[in-house]
């Protein structure tokens, strides 16, 4: 679907003056996609399949979210090709996942997606000419899955074009569930955020989400929701 059509849906609610950035590309001083580091919630009891982390639902600020006891074990085939379809309340984004170059990150994303962790989660931070951020079950930028894992930086993966799927973090080795998709090249993020995918169809959707009217903290006034993430393994 063309970007022009998507933007027409929000024409009445998106005055140009609402754009956060005035320049066509982000400045190096722009605040990067962050996942505010919060105390890990204790997970002491719950259910788990054999070899899987224990899952427990906890109440946080009136929200009931899933928390896991540990990083999921490696379940993917790093020699295979994986794709993800992020179904949103607008339209879908199709993404190629880089399993061979960021195996831990892709494995984590697939685990959470298949477990329904992202279902109903909003894009809580959107910035025109920069990126859109999601993956926090609290919808505030402070939530996660209950664990953190290491970065995976690869020299051949860079923020050199729009559509990069990468992890938000609060510093080294603080990856969890929050991720972002870029809408322009963002080279100032190289070496700071793990890249683990690339949009292959639906860049206009990411662009449209970045342009919705937002309020304090770049939070959309009208929520844009992830309905689900479908994972496919291609031989």
Feature annotation, model-predicted:
Residues 1-5:
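Positively charged n-region of N-terminal signal peptides that target proteins for export
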Residues 6-7, 15, 19-235:
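Cyclophilin-like peptidyl-prolyl cis-trans isomerases
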């Amino acid at each position: 679907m063309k970007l022009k059509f998507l933007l027409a849906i929000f024409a009445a609610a998106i005055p140009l003056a609402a754009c956060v950035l005035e320049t066509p590309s982000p400045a190096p001083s722009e605040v990067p996609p962050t996942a505010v580091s919060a105390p890990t919630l204790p997970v002491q009891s719950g259910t788990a399949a054999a070899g899987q982390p224990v899952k427990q639902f906890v109440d946080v600020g009136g929200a009931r979210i899933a928390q896991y006891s540990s990083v999921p074990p490696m379940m993917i085939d790093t020699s295979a090709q994986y794709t993800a379809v992020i179904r949103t309340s607008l339209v879908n984004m199709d993404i190629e996942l880089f399993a061979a170059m960021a195996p831990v990150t892709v494995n984590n994303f697939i685990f959470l997606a298949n477990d329904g962790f992202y279902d109903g989660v909003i894009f809580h931070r959107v910035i025109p000419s920069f990126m859109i951020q999601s993956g926090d079950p609290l919808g505030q930028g402070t939530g996660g899955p209950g664990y953190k894992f290491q970065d995976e930086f690869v020299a051949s993966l860079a923020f050199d074009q729009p559509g990069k799927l990468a992890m938000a973090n609060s510093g080294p080795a603080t990856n969890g569930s929050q991720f972002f998709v870029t809408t322009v090249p963002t080279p100032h993020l190289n070496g700071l955020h793990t890249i683990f995918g690339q949009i292959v169809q639906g860049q206009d959707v990411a662009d449209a989400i970045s342009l919705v009217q937002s309020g304090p903290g770049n939070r959309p006034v009208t929520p844009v929701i992830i309905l689900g993430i479908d994972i496919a393994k291609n031989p």
